[in-house]
Design a protein with these regions (language model features):
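Helix-loop-helix junctions that connect adjacent transmembrane segments
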Residues: 19-44, 69-198
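Loop-to-transmembrane-helix entry motif
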Residues: 63, 150, 203-206
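Structural signal for the C-terminal ends of transmembrane alpha-helices
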Residues: 51-57, 134
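Non-catalytic, surface-exposed connector residues within folded enzymatic/regulatory domains
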Residues: 1, 5, 63, 146, ...
Length: 222
């Protein structure tokens, strides 16, 4: 659900660029004094990915591979655009919110430890590769390569994209954005590239949802 909500931010921005206004949140009522909201785009993508999985494993794997290639290409495009605008002064002070986890007046935890908790979530899901053991020809070798290899590649990409993003633009300017990568590229006077990155994100981010749903079906089967 968290990935689906994140995807809806990029999808909403992309649709807005085409003159289509689809709200990310619709009022859904109230519970215990808190307003409830409904995210139509997030619900749509979950059902769309579930429909793809129903078609079969082979079809899902082919689509997933193609989308991962697109996703990596978009990140490389971002690095090519952002790195020339890198400004080391954006890293000063290096840890403006401290090294601990300090709640703000709005209740949001800030600091290195709070960020580490979010990054832990970013690594959640690599174990889903193990649920595909039944389809692997040599699971003892293939699963080790799949899990460790994907973690190494993703870690390097996380570090490179994070450093390039902060170096190209002050983090306060994009921290609250629903499409931060595209927002940074747009601020560098590259609207076409921003549209491409936003479009690829809208298409490729659902691969994460696909991996989770695929793994869940195998867990239920066992």
């Amino acid at each position: 659900s968290a990935v689906a909500v994140g995807w809806s931010g990029y999808a909403s921005g992309l649709l807005t660029g085409f003159g289509i206004d689809v709200p990310q949140m619709l009022p859904f009522g109230e519970m215990a004094g808190h307003a409830l909201h409904f995210n139509p785009l997030a619900v749509f993508i979950i059902f769309a990915v579930a429909g793809l999985l129903i078609l079969g494993t082979r079809e899902s794997a082919w689509v997933n591979s193609a989308l991962v290639v697109l996703k990596i290409a978009a990140l490389i495009l971002f690095l090519v655009i952002a790195l020339p605008a890198f400004d080391i002064s954006h890293f000063t002070p290096f840890a403006p919110f401290g090294w601990g986890s300090t709640p703000t007046e709005t209740g949001v935890n800030t600091g290195v430890m709070a960020a580490a908790a979010v990054m832990f979530f970013a690594f959640y899901g690599f174990d889903a590769v193990s649920t595909a053991a039944e389809e692997a020809k040599n699971p003892g070798r293939d699963l080790a390569i799949g899990i460790i290899g994907s973690m190494v590649i993703c870690t390097l990409l996380y570090m490179a994209v994070g450093a390039a993003a902060i170096g190209a633009m002050d983090f306060n300017a994009f921290a609250a954005s629903g499409e931060p990568i595209a927002e940074i590229v747009r601020s560098l006077n590259q609207p076409e590239a921003a549209a491409i990155i936003g479009g690829v994100a809208s298409i490729a981010i659902p691969t994460v949802i696909l991996a989770f749903l695929y793994g869940q079906t195998r867990i239920f089967y066992v």
